[in-house]
């Protein structure tokens, strides 16, 4: 599909809201003289799954799932007046003038592999429901960028000139147990516990140029981090009658930094994992067609990973 993901300034939005700046080709004065036809993004995934659901007895059930996903994609774009050294290209001379910037076409690619499995044993009794389970997943992706074409370039340019490459790997495993027990008629206690371990490894070069380095170069990626998380949750639910319910809960949630938290944060301290304590209490009312409820909560974050942009 053709790119359409850049925003518009207020003036353009008011006067020409259908204008799409993606793929614009500019002359030396910055005037748009055309658009690049192959300003596209492409991605495909192939999914494989193997599922087993086995009823072992009236009370016990076994679930197993294996999965594998193969993915590949890229986006190609025309870039105006780009600094050549940022793409591993040597400035060139023409008519006695050194050319350090030129228009070019670049292609950024990703090749990914994701596989793993999950399982659970589920028990259902008169007053007790319980489950134990877990999962293990492995993800590997290769990011790289190529220069497809450079305007009026007089230096050496190999076909599909590669200017960055990095390989990321993530291993993610967990085990858990959870119960729901009817303490009294209409009063249920529920709890679950999860232990999760994961490891990140990213090696290679990022696609961002570090002008603060001496000499300047592509930002290196050398990340090897592991995390261990314990995520418990407990609560109580009280069905007062057919119309009124009360509930309260406490939970702990931990979250690892994402790939972008690492690659976009190379000039600052390494990102840390996020931890949240969640306290909730609520009430619901239901009668006929009418439903109403109130939920009070307090989330206590440490090292919150906040989205920006």
Which role does the model predict for each range below?
Residues 27-37, 45-47, 97-106, 113-114, ...:
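Extracytoplasmic loops and strand-loop junctions of Gram-negative outer membrane beta-barrel proteins
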Residues 129-133:
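A structural preference for short, pocket-lining loop segments at secondary-structure junctions
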Residues 96-120, 270-272, 278-280, 285-309:
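Outer membrane beta-barrel strand-and-loop segments of large Gram-negative receptors
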Residues 2-19, 78-89, 143-156, 205-216, ...:
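Flexible, surface-exposed loop regions and adjacent strand-edge segments
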Residues 34-77, 104-126, 164-188, 224-231, ...:
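Outer-membrane beta-barrel transmembrane strands
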Residues 83-106, 111, 145-162, 245, ...:
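Feature marks flexible
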């Amino acid at each position: 599909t053709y790119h359409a993901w850049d925003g518009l300034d207020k003036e353009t939005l008011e006067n020409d809201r259908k204008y799409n700046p993606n793929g614009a080709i500019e002359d030396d004065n910055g005037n748009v003289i055309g658009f690049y036809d192959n300003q596209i993004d492409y991605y495909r995934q192939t999914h494989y799954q193997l599922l087993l659901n086995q009823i072992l007895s009236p009370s016990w059930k076994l679930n197993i799932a294996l999965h594998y996903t193969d993915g590949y994609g890229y986006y190609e774009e025309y870039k105006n007046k780009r600094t050549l050294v940022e793409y591993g290209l040597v400035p060139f001379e023409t008519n006695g003038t050194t050319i350090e910037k030129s228009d070019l076409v670049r292609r950024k690619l990703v090749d990914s592999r994701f596989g793993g499995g999950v399982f659970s044993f589920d028990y259902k009794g008169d007053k007790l429901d319980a489950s134990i389970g877990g999962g293990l997943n492995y993800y590997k992706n290769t990011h790289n960028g190529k220069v497809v074409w450079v305007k009026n370039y007089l230096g050496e340019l190999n076909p599909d000139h590669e200017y960055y490459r990095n390989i990321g790997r993530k291993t993610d495993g967990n085990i858990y147990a959870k119960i729901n027990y009817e303490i009294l008629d209409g009063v249920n206690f529920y709890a679950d516990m999860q232990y999760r371990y994961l490891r990140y490894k990213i090696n290679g070069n990022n696609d961002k140029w570090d002008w603060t380095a001496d000499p300047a170069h592509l930002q290196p990626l050398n990340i090897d981090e592991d995390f261990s998380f314990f995520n418990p949750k407990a609560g109580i639910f009280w069905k007062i009658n057919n119309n009124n319910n009360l509930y309260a809960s406490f939970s702990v949630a931990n979250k690892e930094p994402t790939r972008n938290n690492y690659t976009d944060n190379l000039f600052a301290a390494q990102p840390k994992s996020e931890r949240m304590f969640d306290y909730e209490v609520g009430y619901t009312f239901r009668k006929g067609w009418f439903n109403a409820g109130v939920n009070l909560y307090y989330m206590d974050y440490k090292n919150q990973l906040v989205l920006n942009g």
